[in-house]
Amino acid sequence: MKDLIIDLVSSPTPLATVAEQKNLSLRSAVYMQVAHYLRRSRKVLTSPTQYKLLKGQKEFGYATVGLNLAPATEAYFLTRVNMCPSASKGCLATCLRHSGQNIFTQGKIARIARTVLWLEFRPEFLAIVGAEVR
């Protein structure tokens, strides 16, 4: 998996757009998204202009960004890692991945891609997030 993503990053071929990613297999779409993150053509952290994050900024005066990773076994087919190993059945049933914008395919692709980035490209993940926070 890691080698395929590195090949995508170093390839001169343009990466798939969000609209094009929807037509790919989930695995291919995730690889493409991770490559976008590594090329820094897409942000890892969610925008502080997102409604719920903006509300907190207005209340407390601090810019807030979000980072949603794949919960429990959502990314297991690629990572073989359970991100929520201690989650109860109740927690899994009420997980926020089942609500709001999280239910859409692009959100799922992004969550899994961020999780792959965290697990497989940790130094790069930390550098990217550090740069985005600054």
Where do the protein language model's features map onto the residues?
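Class I S-adenosyl-L-methionine
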Residues: 1-134
